[in-house]
Amino acid sequence: MTKNKKEFTEAPVNFGANLGLMLDLYDDYLQDPSSVPEDLQVLFSTIKTGEAHIEAKPTTDGGGSQAGDSTIKRVMRLIDNIRQYGHLKADIYPVNPPERQNVPKLEIEDFDLDKETLEKISSGIVSEHFKDIYDNAYDAIVRMERRYKGPIAFEYTHINNNKERVWLKRRIETPYKASLNDNQKKELFKKLAHVEGFEKYLHKNFVGAKRFSIEGVDTLVPMLQHTITLAGNEGIKNIQIGMAHRGRLNVLTHVLEKPYEMMISEFMHTDPMKFLPEDGSLELTSGWTSDVKYHLGGVKTTNSYGIEQRISLANNPSHLEIVAPVVAGKTRAAQDNTHQVGGPSTDFHKAMPIIIHGDAAYPGQGINFETMNLGSLKGYSTGGSLHIITNNRIGFTTEPFDGRSTTYSSDVAKGYDVPILHVNADDVEATIEAIEIAMEFRKEFHKDVVIDLVGYRRYGHNEMDEPSITNPVPYQNIRKHDSVEILYGKKLVDEGIISEDEMNEVIDSVQKEMRTAHDKIDKNDKMNNPDMEKPESLQLPLQSDTKDFSFDHLKEINDAMLDYPKDFHVLKKLNKVLEKRREPFEKEGGLVDWAQAEQLAFATILQDGTSIRLTGQDSERGTFSHRHAVLHDEENGNTFTPLHHVPQQQATFDIHNSPLSEAAVVGFEYGYNVENKGNFNIWEAQYGDFSNMSQMMFDNFLSSSRAKWGERSGLTLFLPHAFEGQGPEHSSARLERFLQLAAENNSTVVNLSSASNYFHLLRAQAASLDTLEMRPLIVMSPKSLLRNKTVAKPIDEFTSGGFKPIITEDIDEQKVKKVILASGKMYIDLKEYLAKNPNDSILLIAVERLYPFPEEEIKEVLKSLPHLENVSWVQEEPKNQGAWLFVYPYLKALVANKYDLTYHGRIQRAAPAEGDGEIHKLVQTKIIESSINN
């Protein structure tokens, strides 16, 4: 027991049953004060100096204190409550504050304390940051209450990391020195006047036009401007912003500096591009079908925020929150250096993401949880996203009590161990401080921060909507509530910083500025593009890469992939499998299987200077234990990545096992590729069946982004697909959905049957990247075919040639009466059946590329068959699924009533496949035999 027991116990602080523990902690404190929590450091310091001589007041009232509790303990409980629950009483609601029920006790009286008692206690007991500022605990607690119950409410006590909690406590409780001088306040008012004036002008001159006004959370714009300035102070030159439609036009105009003339032109349906700045600083793209104005993004290169920065606002569909992982991926791409050997290096200070959410959608859309889960993962971290919830406390017509089960819309973020700052959107200077705290935290800890910007919505969901139909009571108060422009202007008038005339002059000047811009536009200059033709670069299918390789070149690569460090111990069982990859180069009849073909393709692509990033669940090994891109030492668990050691490598290879998420990971990879168009981004599904968890990414980004926004992507999808008796959830990648989305040469969809064709396909896709011809590639990748000898090919098929849209057999054309078209595993099943049961009247064709459909190639084959009678399409999917409904119009045109056209496959089904493996075999056999014999 401590030698200082007498000194300790004589201090009249009653620890009751915890005395023994406290004595031990006091011993630790005397040896090293930093070894105990800061609250105890303060307490122990008062004991040591005799400041703790306060008589305990036994009580059983108010604060729930038990008889014998000390005054100090009650003070500390009050302080803890203020820190933990002060946000519930904070002044964060500009209008219509909610009624809180059962709020924890937060007042001095609740703990049987009073001013007289507290004035006898050192302020250090309240916070170590107050010791030299306030004379006593009472003054310090008053300060604490103002801080924790003021216009910024803090939630950080849920964070597990003590270092982060201590940092936040110090930052919050250290008296804040206002960062804004009088001139800066004037500028801030002018910015608000432009934000508000922009909305007022549009509201007056384009009555009922949808713009999804920012009014009610107007301070978002100066918050973004200040964030970008602070980022510039850190040397961050790339800012990636994602947001939905509310306030988007204002952000485009006042953050990305899109000219008023361009924005007004869009409302007038005239050509806005006539007003695009000639200096090239503003990049705005649009596709041939385009999109509504409040979905469009842009990129601005500007010096307006202190240094030259590239500010990007991501294009966005109406699907709320779905852009979040896209922005994260774009940011990571900007941070990664892929022009080096091995894996990429990541610099979090090169770029940062700002993701703007809605209060109804943030807790409502699961994509947010998936995206935040990426935040600290090696393959996905961006060094911290700044999340701003534009909280207008309503979702269309739905109020919070119907929209979420939590106190705040931000509560879902607590599970990710990040700080949350709620701030009153009408307190302009508080919003600026919130941004400063958030940016300092991100810089210190490289973690996400959430700011809940609490405001209101001035009008309905859109400007044609009448909110009083469903929300009459809130809107009675909102209509009477002054805008933040007026509130802040009056505040500056009261402070003597500006006069009332100056305030009104600034407000009026914005309307004049917009009127001047409006007058420059010729209302008769209407846009007229009824044909909406796709660009010339998309007129042709993906072109084959015809580069030849010598046998020795590929052998050198293969040998390097099997050359491990001397002290690295590959699992013996695995090593035997990998050593077989030498056989194609050393043994007659040796074949290159699917995984080896992929590795050789990747290596040659890296030699060409194209970086590769492959992610997905279990992708390092491969779901079917085929890839083994990352090897693990069986003795110590160390890893080795052979593709980091390719001879003459010119770019990085990056591979990561993804979290168990589809939507966010696909969105991340899409964003990465949009930002770094020269990078070969690949997402691999664990099973293709699970890819539909990302359907909105396929629908709204991958397939349509170029047509809508002019946004090019070359993202590649590997989707394991084949009917192998594993049931309806492990058979189908829903090929039919990708074919339904295919149009205007917007993608390439393949179902391959040859390892060499896979090799050439990957090289063709890599060669197209960062060109106008680039487009997504969707691969129905194999499962059992990964090790199939019919799929494996000799090395001479890799040294030359190119990708083949169809594969035919050598056959006597005079004997052929039937052509069977099939793809993927169905083709292999038929090929192996015919190998055992030869039939020279049948020509089997592998349709490797389903989209764009190889009409001309098939047509040429059919023309060469003088006695052809029947063309059959064979698939293993049900008739209402797979490729049949897509290929039918093409085949109907090809046969042109000259031949019979028949379908062989499963009948129409609600579920893709049979659940019983034996029944599957019977059905599969029936399809094969029927297609051959009928």
Curated annotation (Swiss-Prot):
Keywords: Glycolysis, Oxidoreductase, Thiamine pyrophosphate
SMART domains: Transket_pyr (SM00861)
Cofactors that this protein relies on: thiamine diphosphate
GO cellular component: cytosol; oxoglutarate dehydrogenase complex
Lineage: Bacteria, Bacillati, Bacillota, Bacilli, Bacillales
Name the UniProt record assigns to this protein: 2-oxoglutarate dehydrogenase E1 component
GO MF annotation, one: oxoglutarate dehydrogenase (succinyl-transferring) activity
E.C. number: 1.2.4.2
Family: Belongs to the alpha-ketoglutarate dehydrogenase family.
Subunit details: Homodimer. Part of the 2-oxoglutarate dehydrogenase (OGDH) complex composed of E1 (2-oxoglutarate dehydrogenase), E2 (dihydrolipoamide succinyltransferase) and E3 (dihydrolipoamide dehydrogenase); the complex contains multiple copies of the three enzymatic components (E1, E2 and E3).
Catalytic activity: N(6)-[(R)-lipoyl]-L-lysyl-[protein] + 2-oxoglutarate + H(+) = N(6)-[(R)-S(8)-succinyldihydrolipoyl]-L-lysyl-[protein] + CO2
Protein purpose: E1 component of the 2-oxoglutarate dehydrogenase (OGDH) complex which catalyzes the decarboxylation of 2-oxoglutarate, the first step in the conversion of 2-oxoglutarate to succinyl-CoA and CO(2).
